[in-house]
Amino acid sequence: MRAFNPAGVAGPFGSYSHGIEVESPMRLVFGSGQTGVDTDGRIGEDIEEQSRLLWRNIQEVLAGAGMKISDIAQLTMLLVRREDLGIAREIREEYLDGHRPASTLLFVAGLAHPDWLIEVDFVAARSSG
């Protein structure tokens, strides 16, 4: 997997890459939207707790396929409240630890549960060999 930012496009406005090249044969994991819910179904109380829970959930999904955060090729982050962006980005950076997948950020009017503040879906890729 190779991250790149073409010279003919303005540089990234955050911690992401404009493109991710994945060569075959690769194993792919398409992660459904993860939210800030623990294994008992309890929703985190605030954006910080929900963000940490969802990144732990992503780690668990990836581990189920023998992958890790650095295998994420693309992610989409959905936020309900614009004022939560700073905390959500800070925690995202903590978990990505310098990894720069292709990324999209969306602000939405709401998510599937009225108490959810954030959701992240992703695609991960790892060599089959």
Where is each model-derived feature located?
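N-terminal presequence-like segments and the immediate start of the first folded domain
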Residues: 1-56, 60-73, 79-129
